[in-house]
Amino acid sequence: MKKTNKAIIYVRGDNRAEQEMICYFYAYRHNIDVLFVTDDIEQVANCEECNMVLVRDASRISRKSIEYYQTVKALNKRGIEVVTTITPENVEFIVNMLKEDLKRGETI
């Protein structure tokens, strides 16, 4: 039986809409079900259904490196993988999709 990936999108700081969009594109490309979007790391840690947290880049977890490593380690211990979605492949996919939309004359 194929494992279903269920994720929470975690956004923090400025440009939340951009962070969310990049994560949704990543989820779409990798067949990941997004349960909800939050800016509360405790909600992520307490989610019993999810096995992933999608973030634009992992530094969004915490600006302080010690807190970052402790948080990621704690999430991993609970079976929640932290996934950075601002990969070159994901950005290229988004750009190419937008170019195709523009060629067809669609508006964003």
Regions found by a protein language model. Name each.
Residues 1-108:
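Short, structured surface patches at the beginning of a domain
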